[in-house]
Design a protein with these regions (language model features):
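Conserved mid-core segment of classical short-chain dehydrogenase/reductases
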Residues: 70, 90-109, 150
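Conserved glycine-rich Rossmann-like NAD(P)H-binding loop of the short-chain dehydrogenase/reductase
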Residues: 29-46
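Conserved glycine-rich cofactor-binding loop
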Residues: 15-16
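C-terminal helical subdomain
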Residues: 175, 179-182, 187, 195-237
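Active-site-adjacent segment of SDR/Rossmann-fold oxidoreductases
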Residues: 129-130, 146, 167-176
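Active-site helix of classical SDR
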Residues: 123, 157-160
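Residue(s) in the substrate-gating loop at a strand-loop-helix junction
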Residues: 141
């Protein structure tokens, strides 16, 4: 059953994992959605599923592509602007992950383009579609702050995104800008990080979603949060 929320969110990386789980939750709560992902078939499957609940525009493409970002901005204008942007799309890099002294620099540049530059580029493309008080959620990782051996490429990119979020918040007090660590999850990206390992003991992405919903619908100040800690602190939503 949907609620009466009259808001629109754009979610990148929304064809599976955390992005899809969040999209489903917001659709059930009455949010209109603009969804992005690189894989067109999976994204269209998601759109077909969620269109039974709410208005959904699905735009396949790569957030590192300027033309794709313009398409996202056009869709945001068609829906009357945005109350929220969730920068969830990211890439791990090589699997298994190399140590930094062995990391191919051209590959590392690609990780930074997707995980750091693209989220900012998306926001620049959408700046005139953001409504006053809009929420920006940049999905980071505990690898941004913990020096896990072998996680230098991905972790440092998420550290850069976390600091970018903090500065963006300081520069735009009219917006609420969050970086959020969703915690370990049973996702394809996490499986890529641990090739050959059974990750069935990791929580499903759905367990982190209530924390993200709290950021999107609550009254928390800009800052960095841990999604599952928010769930416990707020008693769920």
């Amino acid at each position: 059953m949907t609620t009466d929320i009259d808001s629109t969110a754009l979610i990148t990386g929304a064809s599976r994992g955390l992005g899809l789980a969040l999209a489903r939750s917001l659709a059930q709560r009455g949010w209109a959605l603009i969804l992005d992902a690189r894989g067109a078939p999976a994204l269209q499957d998601a759109r077909a599923d969620l269109a039974n609940l709410t208005t959904v525009i699905a735009i396949p493409g790569d957030v590192t592509d300027a033309g794709h970002r313009r398409s996202l901005a056009t869709a945001a204008g068609e829906l009357g602007g945005l109350e929220a942007v969730v920068n969830n799309a990211s890439i791990l890099g090589p699997s298994p992950q190399p140590q930094l002294l062995d990391y191919p620099l051209d590959v590392l540049e690609g990780v930074y383009r997707t995980n750091v530059i693209a989220p900012l580029a998306v926001l620049q493309a959408l700046r005139y579609a953001l409504k006053p008080g809009a929420r920006i959620v940049n999905v980071t990782s505990d690898a941004a702050v913990e020096p896990y051996p072998g996680w230098g490429g991905y972790g440092s990119s998420k550290a850069a995104l976390q600091q970018l979020s903090a500065i963006l918040a300081a520069e735009n007090p009219d917006l609420r800008v969050y970086s959020v660590d969703p915690g370990d999850m049973r996702t394809q990206l996490h499986q890529q990080a641990f090739p050959g390992e059974d990750i069935c003991d990791r929580p499903l992405p759905e367990e982190s979603v209530p924390g993200l919903v709290e950021l999107l619908e609550g009254n928390l100040s800009s800052g960095h949060y841990e999604a599952r800690a928010l769930v416990h602190a707020q008693g769920g939503r």
